[in-house]
């Protein structure tokens, strides 16, 4: 099972993808010169990437001498393009970066933007589920055996003294998994905690158990290639400064403005959903994803080596990676 899981996870996170353009030589910007850089972001343009958009629209990148272009792709493609220099920065999920580094792909995390993972067990309260031990004999939906959420489910069950054999796992596509919960096809799903608020907003009485309580992990992180970092530490530092300023602007009571701007200029498909997205920023991103005890002590985007190592050990234990790496090889706290 572990071997099959490794193959599936590798296909999902590090499949072969074509580059997004020819590799360009990266040269540091001269004083007062605007340097053009690009970042490839996980998935598609959504208002949850508001800090990036705020940093551009408010001129925070420009203040740092940067002109930033946004591109979007799957996590595996992002890691490869960053490593080869097709783009200077990437914003994939943390698990894909750990997998890439364990396979020798030369990338580093320079901003642990999401201080916690997004995974959660979501259930209808009528199911009788209140804690992990209540899952015995229940139907649990996951998107695939190769998904990070499947690992989260395994760890959650193990911590409760059970195994995957104690539940009935159903594989359901991303577009159908939430409806499967609402319709009663399954008793619970391992999915994104953002859906909890969306369901409550729709009048569905749901609860959640966040997977981070059992498996320390991270969501999206900022990465660069080793070569680019070695030659352009000042550029990386400037990008970090602008990104963190964008996050702080939203934290300081400007979530509504940030969402409205993001939807208008970058994510028009979210038109009409600004209110719920603002609620999600206020209730999940600001207090939980962007901030932690570590960021309070060390600043936004701080990378905790011990916590990263805990995530790496679990991925090794469950066969996601074959070679365990030290977090110090992966992270760099760039000020």
Regions found by a protein language model. Name each.
Residues 231-318:
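Secondary-structure end/capping motifs
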Residues 1-4:
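Positively charged n-region of N-terminal signal peptides that target proteins for export
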Residues 28-171, 183, 187-193, 204, ...:
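Short, glycine-/small- and polar/acidic-enriched structural segments
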Residues 310-335:
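Hinge/cleft segment of the Venus flytrap/periplasmic-binding protein
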Residues 95-96, 170, 176-271:
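Pocket-lining segment of extracytoplasmic ligand-binding domains
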Residues 7-16:
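Bacterial N-terminal signal peptides
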Residues 16-29:
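Bacterial lipoprotein signal-peptidase II cleavage site
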